[in-house]
Amino acid sequence: FPINLKQFGNASIFCITLTCITYVLTYGKVLDWYDDPTIQWATVGAVVAGILFVYIEVTQRNPYYQFDVLKLRTIRFGFLFYFLLMVLNSSSMFVNVFTGIGMKLDNYQNATLGNWSMLGYFIGGIATIWLSVKGVHFKYLFAAGFLFLGLSAMFMYFEVQGAGLYERMKYPVIIRSTGMMFLYSLIPTFATQRMPYKYLSSWICTMLTVRMVLAPSIGTALYSNVLQERQQHYITRYAQNVDMMHPEASASFMQTVQGMQYQGKSKQEAVNMAATSTKGRIQVQATLSAVKEMAGWTLYACLFCMIFVVVLPYPKRKLLT
């Protein structure tokens, strides 16, 4: 068993560190970052627990986590590749945001789209096995994975519009899942090449920490915060030109007011509902513009990662014992 009772305390301290970091990343924007005392305490807890964990592991004879595992270049590469993958994989929110805001779909229909990821995983798994048997170098397989992630973002860039089709939203899900499977399955294979068995538990800890905790938390916080900021930017930008002097906005506003009055609403209620309707249309358009912009930047990031993993040196290393 990779952990005994004596090492359980070390693992608990490590989990406290990750919990505090995740709390700060998840609720920082909601709680206005360090103006909230809980964010301050969580940061202090993460720093103190992290330092305590490192101290215990360095001074203990049989540590839970062996820091020597980070001396292996393939492990460091695996750490980096997993981080890039899971951060960019947070772009999966584009489909949910677009279908929820632009198409007004419910959670069940959004969840149904997610089922198409199984097809992408199947395609990616078969392609990975076939290309590996053919002897294709790891760097080209990694590049293919990031390429598929970029193609998914590019599809969303051109597809995001006011008249998008629900049936077409399965394609970015399939493409993204295919690319994710390339990287998800090959990174541990590459990272553990000729790795001494004594580092197995440390590698598993590193892999799960990056893949399941740190990178998804950072990616989700990054994409959600940037989406909110760009959404507010476009709302301010579009609202500047929407007034009674604008022909289309004025006609739509007056039509809504008249429609509400025909339904028995008072003039004030009709005006308020027309203003709410106008605000809603601006918000939808701003959200779609923000998603399109972020999809474009995600495409650039994927292309950068694709080039990066190709030009990165993959030297042979000796077996460490």
Language-model regions: role of each:
Residues N62-L186:
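Transmembrane core module of solute transporters
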Residues V213-Y314, L320:
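Hydrophobic transmembrane architecture of multi-pass small-molecule transporters
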Residues M169-A249:
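Small-residue-rich alpha-helical segments with characteristic i,i+4
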Residues Q7-F14, D35-A46, Y108-G120, P172-M180, ...:
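Alpha-helical transmembrane segments of polytopic membrane proteins
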Residues F1-L80:
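Hydrophobic transmembrane-helix bundles of small-molecule transporters
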Residues V24, E57, T99-G100, A191:
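Hydrophobic alpha-helical interface/terminus motif in multipass membrane transporters
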Residues V48-A49, F148-F158, F304-V311:
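Transmembrane-helix signature of multi-pass solute transporters
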